[in-house]
Amino acid sequence: QGKVTGANVSVKVHDDFMQAAINKQMYQQQYPIDATEPSFAKEVDAHKLWKKIIHNAWKSAEPGVLFWDTIARESVPDCYADLGYKTVSTNPCGEIPLCPYDSCRLLAVNLYSYVKNPFTAEAEFDFELFKKHVAVAQRMMDDIIDLEVEKIEKILAKVSSDPEAETIKRTERELWEKILAKTTQGRRTGVGTTAEGDMLAAMGLRY
């Protein structure tokens, strides 16, 4: 009871928190986090909290850590923050940073499957096959965007045909219109990898 299941839990960490942890200083947690006059605020020992985070990550693989300022600095969509692509959150498990009304589209390429002669002295990574499959994966993810657009258009048509009054339907219609705009303009895809540890082990590489 009271436990989160079916999702990875991540902690959103800013540079000033990490600096406070390094310097063993106190850090103010607050809500809303970007408010000049927060409705809730509490000071915590940053170093002690950081040790607790990394201990639990070591012990149970939870929580993940999202270095938020690094994400904002290095995220390609944040180059277009003035056009509405500023990163504000992630999908439930934290794999992909998202701007408002954007969608989580993920595909993982299994790195272990590209190891030839695994767990032998002749083990090697098949880079040519990997490059070929990554290109196919990206092409497929882009096609998924078009399928998503079709579904959103059907949802919008359904909203329009519903018998409810326009004042009732307006909120839902505007929501899906915003999602459609982000989908067609940004066309964000999330091609990632999995089984990195298995790949390294199969190649006899320590990490």
Regions found by a protein language model. Give the residues of each.
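Core structural elements
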Residues: 143, 147-149, 154-203
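Active-site cavity-forming subdomains of large catalytic enzyme subunits
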Residues: 1-133, 137, 146-160, 175-182
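Intrinsic disorder at enzyme termini
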Residues: 25, 29-34, 189, 198, ...
